[in-house]
Amino acid sequence: MLPVVALIGRTNVGKSTLFNYLTRTRDALVADFPGLTRDRQYGRVQRGERDYFVVDTGGIIEAAEGIDDQAMKQVDHVLDEADVILFLVDVHAGMTAGDELIADRLRRINKPVLLVANKIDGTQALIAGAEFHAFGLGEPLLISAAHGTGVHALLERVEALLPESGETGETEAEGGIRIAVVGRPNVGKSTLVNRILGEERVVVYDQPGTTRDSIYIPFERRGERYTLIDTAGIRRRARVNEGVEKFSVIKSFQAIEKAHVVIYLVDASEGLTDQDANLLGMVLEIGRGLLIGFNKWDGLEPEQREKVKRQIDVKLPFLEFAKKYFISALHGTGVGVLMDAVKPIYQSAMLDLSASRLTQVLQDCLTAHPPPLVRGRRIKLKYAHQGGHNPPVVVIHGNQTEDLPAAYRRYLGNEFRNAFKLQGVPLKLVFKSAENPFQGRRNELTERQIRKRRRMIRHVKKR
């Protein structure tokens, strides 16, 4: 599971500014979920070899300004979920009663806490951070989130404290094909999980996976071993208070990251929402095999069904590779067909692609449709090899590949997909250009060449 970094602090200390700085400068994606919150509060950060989630808990701590017990319980839930906590304070405002209350709670937990003194612009840094030593949380890290001052050093400290993302509480090799059931609240995730397990009539048990309480449910189907990653129950508990509600999104992300295949469930009676499209975009970016189940299909009138199918064409054009199934989790209609598709998708995700076959497919593509000219020169694509699994990654080497148009990249992706009969998985293409050995080098003239050049210049001037 990917680790979680939580930003804690009072209102207007710069949590959102720091969050925006981190997500603006990361190498991967940020997920926005307008259906859950009006603010950008959930981000996935990839920096070098480190990969983790960052959460702006602004709304939680703002609720705590009243210093009531219920608000502090929400803070406690945040602290339980996070691996590293960044406690932000405002050097201009100095120490406040709200800061002291939060610091008192942080001193009692057994988790890494970094004290971050923000807004050091226009102040003497050492003097600005001095008073915060009184919190007893170590040396304050002085930053300006607005301008990025000190943020690089802060991230180095954070990443040194994070657990490795591969550390989990269950043995991956023993679980078979891992399936994550993901979707918005109340779309029937728990019903689908119970239907899948009930159909097979096997004895199952809840195996706690990590400290984040994802539930791993092993079962067998037609002699094949599977593990359901069930996050459905997590979201039910999320209704209790806002603190857990926010982290339910992170739990969904972690379930997607852990899975081989994702079953994304949509409530067909409500149609496709923007939140559905955002979550599906996350699955695509992470690169997992995907099945989309439209639940409660049996309760729709014919005109409603046509409306949903039109929505699929309009809102999900980027998921042409994903199979869509129209099911009823409650009555079991279509669930068997849905499960039959899981194994072929897993096999596509883990397929070994030989370099010779990939290069042959590439050459066939070039023969049928050569790359376009760029600045009068044709882009050269030379050979291809596999770069990874789940999702399948194809690395293509050539010259000027950075100038290859998006349309031609899509053409290559479709041809590779068809050639290897990949089902239900995104295919990632990585283009690499050969390095120019002379780039950045200047020809150093000898003394003799310099004297000759000067004579030539004088000769030209005399003429």
UniProtKB/Swiss-Prot annotation:
Gene3D superfamilies: 3.30.300.20, P-loop containing nucleotide triphosphate hydrolases (3.40.50.300). Residues 351-435 form the KH-like domain. The keyword Repeat applies. The keyword Chloroplast does not apply. It comes from the Bacteria. GTP 1 binds at residues 9-16, 56-60, 118-121. Keywords: GTP-binding, Nucleotide-binding, Repeat, Ribosome biogenesis. Pfam families: KH_dom-like, MMR_HSR1. GO terms for molecular function: GTP binding; ribosome binding. NCBIfam families: GTPase_EngA (TIGR03594), small_GTP (TIGR00231). GTPase that plays an essential role in the late steps of ribosome biogenesis. Associates with the 50S ribosomal subunit. PANTHER family: GTPASE DER. This is GTPase Der.
